[in-house]
From Swiss-Prot:
Protein name as it appears in the record: Glutamate racemase
Gene designation: murI
InterPro entries recorded: Asp/Glu/hydantoin_racemase (IPR015942), Asp/Glu_race (IPR001920), Asp/Glu_racemase_AS_2 (IPR033134), Glu_race (IPR004391)
Origin species: Bartonella quintana (strain Toulouse) (Rochalimaea quintana)
Function as written in the Swiss-Prot or TrEMBL entry: Provides the (R)-glutamate required for cell wall biosynthesis.
The enzyme's E.C. designation: 5.1.1.3
GO BP term (any one): peptidoglycan biosynthetic process
Annotated substrate binding sites: 10-11, 42-43, 75-76, 190-191
Catalytic activity: L-glutamate = D-glutamate
Stored PANTHER family: GLUTAMATE RACEMASE (PTHR21198:SF2)
Residues annotated as transmembrane: none
Source species, domain of life: Bacteria
Amino acid sequence: MNERPILFFDSGIGGLTVLREVRVLIPETQFIYVADDAGFPYGNWEENVLKNHILKVFTNLLTLYNPTLCVVACNTVSTLMMADLRKEFPHTLFVGTVPAIKLAAKQTKSGFISVLATPGTVKRAYTRELINSFAGQCHVQLVGSEKLAAFAEDYLRGKPIDLEELRNEILPCFFEQNGKYTDTIVLACTHYPFLINLFREQALWPVKWIDPAKAIAKHIRSLLPERMYHKNTKKLKDFALFTSQNITSSTKHLLKEFGLNITKGVDFEM
């Protein structure tokens, strides 16, 4: 019996932060990485248009690749429509990436938390439900950046980043009141961990930056049968699919470092 792959989906290359952690736990599984970079960034899409687009894309992806599990490695999509995906495709296992607010609430000492996300994730009702459920006793600052995901894409491609602009994007995360300071910042976009060293350099004061990728990887492993992570050899190669034609040599090099061969210009809405 052929092993079914695990499929990762994101609007760009941010989902690689989750893929690399899953690979550590189940390295012999085949991974397919789908980057809908023709639609990047999702944070600027109207909700209904984005929902319809994602449903069409997944209809084709599931037909083509029949994955054992789909990782929606995009906070914007995960906070918008995980319920829709599970309802539309009831026989497919979906794992989303949502802001790690519960973990932040457990770890904060000051009670002051910031959630650094895209504008789409910030405005979602689901994000506020997480705050009400797990961080009701905390002061939670929601910060939606329109630039950081693109900065991460550029940074990984070796392009220069305007550090002053980056600093301005994260400044609202640092909040002080009555002698208490923000001590925990949730990275609520899978792109952002790629910028973590720059964030630390530009921070107003030391904070704990929470990247949920390791926790997501452990959750994914817990959902899979043991035979998937006790195999001795990898039978099928991993690969990446990009929906645009605009793939630079630096992107190809990056994906090669992740062991992913690229196919570009794939249209999953057909």
